[in-house]
Amino acid sequence: MKKLKKPIIITALAIFTIYLFSLFVDYYGDWLWFKNMGYDSVFDTILLTKILSFILFFLIFILFSGIHIHFAYHGGSQSRNNIPLADDDPRQKILPLYQGKAVAWLWAVIILFFAIVMGSYASAYWHDFLKFIYPSSFDLKEPIFGKDAGFYIFTLPVYQFVVSWYLFMVVITFIGVLSSYYIDTAFNFTSRKFNITGKAKSHLTQLTAFFALGVSALYFIKLYNILYSSHGVAYGPSYMDVHAQIPAYWTILVMSLIITILLFFYPFYKKRKVIVSALGLWVLVWAGFVWIYPGIVEQYIVKPNELKKETPYILNNIKFTRTAFGLDNIKVKPFSVDQNITYKDILDNRHTIENIRLWDRRPLIQTYKQLQEIRLYYDFKNVQVDRYHFHKYTEVVLGARELPELGIPARAQTWVNNHLIYTHGYGVVMNPVNEITSDGMPELIVKDIPPTTSVNLNIKQMAIYYGEETNQFVLVNTRAKEFDYPKGDDNVYASYAGKGGVQISSLFRRLVYAWKFSDINILFTGYLTKQSRIMFHRNIMQRVATLAPFLSFDSQPYPVVGKDGKLYWIQDAYTTSNMFPYSEPLYHNPIERGINYINNSVKIVIDAYDGDVSFYVINPKDPLVQTYEKIYPKLFKPFSNMPGFLKAHIRYPTDLFNIQTKMYNVYHMTDPKVFYNQEDYWEIPNETYSRGEQKMFPYYIIMRLPDTKNEEFILMIPITPSKKDNMNAWLCARCDAPNYGELIVYTLPKDKLIYGPMQIQARINQQPDISSELTLWGQQGSRVIKGNQLVIPIKNSFIYVEPVYLQSEEGQIPELKRVIVAFKEKVEMRKTLDEALEAVFNVAPGQMANPQQSAGKHVGGRTVLSIEAHKALEHYNKAMDSLRQNDWANFGKELDEMKSVLLKMTQSETKSSGMPKVK
């Protein structure tokens, strides 16, 4: 045994040393990274909180459990052999070994192990502890206990943790004490009775008192947790919760405190019947008040009068949910629909028409991949919609050309290539949302490598070291030249000239990162110099989450080409909680499961070249971000500090807009009776994409809102009634200053049928000429892709636009071949949007493209020539119908009428131009 003891100790010490070194390396490597980023104070705050919380709860467990087990071990040994054991009792063999220093050391190791576990468990709640220390007020009190909402978000989570942690500690200690007394034969079960020594009985009783105290605290917490009840017709406390559950919890709480006192003082009066009676009464009261009584109240008081009883609680739920999701700030405006716009209105809203997004992001990314990846190792992970000021305000789609981890061919996947040479992507691709080439491709205004542009856009530094697909570490400023971009048959190489990454000049730092990344090549490579840097956490989502793990993030970061010629990423960040009182949680969302509070309080900017990250507070009134500013004073900057050229590109985030739309579909109903009956429930409509149906996505568009003078960049979505296809509202979020963040819902008249997206889709499918052409394409071996259907409000009307793409079976490049436009009862499909609009509004071809060529005075919103051209076209169509029916008389009549109109048009143009008259 002695021969084995020394190797075991040495092995244990070696394992412990390796663990400590690994822990140190991990934290030190991260600290260097935080310091390089300028946010070492954030790292220090988080680490210090983790350490202090670990030490505090570690010591509490050591003291509590250690004292009790020490008392049980020594107290039990004094009563050893006082209770006789049966011959087959396993303790007969264990008891002789249960003595001496070895047993004491064994208990010490067990206590130490659980203390480490419980301390680590506590340190995981560092975020809650910091919020507890630096709370902020919401200035909103819930009506049940009169507590500010901040109590539930900043204070209650710590109370919950402390109570659960305390109960775990008591249970673990109780099991340890019970085990010690059992081995020491301080108690025994026989067929006739239960034997236990006085010391063991008193000790176990007092431990039970500690447990009863925890139960009292647990029911105190349960009182406040009623604010998250789901028993009633609406989330939060219901009539039954307030009038039955709360009194029951108070009763159990008081009784638990009484039992705690009785158990604590049991050693002094030793009346077992009192304890047994109290515990029996507690069980009866619990069964009656907590289990049976609430059911009686619900069945016989609430259900027969549910609406009346639940009305005040429904109102509470509506109020707090609307506040938590920012729905109370939505402006409601009527949108009077008469569908009477004319060609003149289309021309007056030409800027809106020119920014209708014909390029659906899903087929467009395939086009980008095929046309602009240039080399097989590049990739476009996503494309995003934004707007730029060129010669005019233009909506564009753009994507960043990144170099993903596995982009280079498998045979070239060497350590040097992966980490030293192929270090970054290069450039962006950009196209206006509605411009198409003659062969159905997007009209690229930024393209190729090195980037070329046909617009006034400064392109200076386009290397992408930090992006959405940059997942592995790279080493820069090494003796190996980095691949910059391809140029013809050759490659251009460069050396990194920025400040991104951690300097890795010393041997110790190389050892640290070799250990951290489990990559010994970092230690032994000969390519590193004193100027070399290691870049990691390069994925922008991971990067911001590492810097600010207490924030939640939008799933759609987007690239921005700055006026300084550099590429940036803008990432929306949210403050969230699942503890806002009375607020309905949302479980199915792209941000965080079960949240019931969200605020887009922070905009994050990431430099794609240097990796610099800046956190700008756009909503300083948010209490959660106020708390984070107190905790991390050096992390956040006021939004006013953001460069103006980046402010021009902030947009309302789609994830938040989707969440708010889902919640508003229910919580626009502020009348409790309407809410109770769910009689005005709204839905996000379906749309057809490719060949299947899916929920419609919100879309960005530049348009002029009702009662405004100028076009602006907005995010919008149409809304339909539940299980209906007609449209009854549309919701938009304004993205441009000074109205950024303003939400408006435009409600449509209930006495009119306004077509929704699926009704328009049905009308499209019913058009023989459209369906036959699409079917023919499909039969010829091409895949027909119907893109996003866009509902476009113009004045007091709607037009509907749907692009149609064609993708051959052999190729992967979708081509935009047709555009469908619907207005009122007319549906037309043409090669371009202008042609489709001309067809829908019966305008002579070419006038949409050249509206300035139309001559004559404006009459009723249309020019004289436009009206006469429309008449001539009508006579021509009637003449052709007569010809097909062999009605020669009517055919001649319609031709004469058409000739008369054309002569009138010619004379009108002659007067305005001074040309000779046509006879």
Swiss-Prot record:
Entry GO terms, CC: extracellular region; plasma membrane
Subcellular location: Cell membrane
Segments passing through the bilayer: 8-28, 51-71, 102-122, 158-178, 207-227, 246-266, 274-294
Keywords in alphabetical order: Cell membrane, Membrane, Transmembrane, Transmembrane helix
Membrane topology: Multi-pass membrane protein
Domain of life: Bacteria
The keyword rRNA-binding is assigned to this record: no
InterPro entries to which the protein is assigned, alphabetical: UPF0182
Protein family: Belongs to the UPF0182 family.
The protein's name: UPF0182 protein SUN_1015
Species lineage: Bacteria, Pseudomonadati, Campylobacterota, Epsilonproteobacteria, Campylobacterales
